[in-house]
Amino acid sequence: MRESGILMPVSSLPGPYGIGCFGKAAFQFVDFLSAAGQTIWQLLPLSPTGYGDSPYQSCSAFAGNPYFVDLETLEKEGLLTAADLKAESWGKDPLEVDYGTLYVSRFAVLRKAYAAWRSQCAGLHGCAYYYPDDYYAFTLANEDWLDDYALYMALKAANKMKNWVEWDAPYRRRDKAALAAFAAENEEEIGFWKFVQYKFSVQWQAVKAYANEKGVQILGDIPIYVSADSVDAWVGGKLFELDADGRFARVAGCPPDYFSADGQLWGNPLYDWAYHKKTGYAWWVRRVRHALGIYDLLRIDHFRGFDTYWAIPATSTTARTGKWENGPGMELFDALEAALGKPPIIAEDLGELFPSVRKLLADSTFPGMKVLQFAFGGGDNEYLPHNHVKNGVVYPGTHDNTTLTDWWENGASQKEKATAAAYLHLTSCKPTAKEVAAVKTAAARTALLRAALGSVADRAIIPMYDWLGLGAEAHLNTPGKLGGNWAWRAKAGFDSKALAAQIEAECVVYCRCNADVQNVK
């Protein structure tokens, strides 16, 4: 079945408290998607943001982002007051996330909510604290990661949020006696981090259930790597190329490509794939199983890294000096299927692709991705719509691309614009520079959107900012740039009935709306 969806980060939803969250705006956006005939809501990772405010550099592969907990829901539960919310600063610009301000204000308010929650639970049933049954169910169901995560975050708080490799040796090396003593002395702090994850889970599951009731699937995102400063690296040990003190000789990244002339030096620890194989890829099975409890569909970032990955000396200042190493290949995906059934994975197969990567994608039968902003460099480019395949997902651009408006006005070369203009019937087949210059941005954007929707690919995902026609102000991420990313927020009222009707009309033409809408139209 042909489908279409919208890429819209939770962080980009409007609201009064500095960042999008699981409150009214999330439910309203689901209503908007349904009204527009869309069947997919694609998200960025819901994990806590880390270095550079990136959701791809998280302190946990399993935890949720505390910033997404809806504060107004906590207020309704009696855990916060209006005065609590007014007492904090939430940033100067409602259209941009101020992560520095948010770090201070959000956690201050969440700690007030936790204190109120503990007060509500104090002395119940003759216990010092008796928490709700669903809290105990949540902690039990997630104990394989939650206990370590909460302990890790409490230790970070006690160590002024330093990287775990800078902690004292007993904690860095996970000495059992030292950790047990710390946990006993910091029970309340550890409980805070569990409380936040509990509220995250309850609120997110309500949003997801509502979306599913409306016929909208949630497409989540799994970064291939974990952060060096993460509970996963601290606990993982033999899963990664680390010694007991967290030192590593090589780190992850990717070679020079369209996005960066120096490549991308991510700095993540590399997996010890030989050890993963010995365990039957148990950690990856746990990770994907957990993700399938949060999302309906999974986009796995940097799919090519499962075939061959770029290993960079830790002392390098750019990614140019790396070398290719072999990944686990189909063995990993066979293990996932044996444990979980065929996982609903979409492979992010962008970048330099060896024939072996293409074979892995074919063997896995996962749909890959096509990005129109890469299509117009000349020749019979694989990203041109006539080269798309049915088992695929087409995008005008991803979160790493700029918006269509900014691409046409500032990003595309003259050759790309001329090629695109001719291909999209905006000019003659061999346009002059004057013809290309006469093409209006709005016309180019509409033509590119329709090219995506008209693709033979089963799924088309359009970023929300491209439906809105926004420019560089909505560019989510510039790879290789530290700071100033992941900040865009939509204006209140962006998800209007008029825009929903426009999107529905466009998608009906290309038979991409949900079945109810398509059959009526």
What are these regions (language model features)?
Residues 34, 204-212, 337, 361-362:
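Surface-exposed amphipathic alpha-helices with a cationic face
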Residues 24-49, 294-295, 452:
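Catalytic domains of carbohydrate-active enzymes, especially glycoside hydrolases
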Residues 9, 18, 53-197, 226-461, ...:
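Alpha-amylase-like alpha-glycosidases and glucanotransferases acting on alpha-linked glucans and related
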